């Protein structure tokens, strides 16, 4: 959400309150969770694209604590306080390879759930979580090929649409689908 003012200046705090009331009213009316990325107030029409991009970027913060109104001030606070611990992709790959070769669906699910629990608890944004998964998937393919799966031909499909997969659970579903496909290919092709 953006606001272009023509004649009188509106303080950012007032704008944030208006948006919070509007979103709160919509949420209670429709009975659903709606999130609003709110840009700073601006006076120059030439800033419209920049402010829309700012509001869109802030929407990715909704996964952190379920806040409905995501303001630039909130985004700055989060980014200044947040320290992302590194995810140990190497250990995860070892565990996943073992579970995939054993065709242990429950263990694969447990590992993926643990990875996403780590992302949630560490306040990873969804694009950051996906980047870690892309790295992990590349290491996983490499490790499977070294283990004799030279015919493995499964590529990561690219980052899912953030408008559809806009939660940890959504991304976790995509990752579990990838793991199921790898498990199926291992079962089907065996080791060379």
Question: Where are the regions a protein language model picked out?
Answer:
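Cytosolic nucleotide-utilizing catalytic cores of signal-transduction proteins
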Residues: 1-192
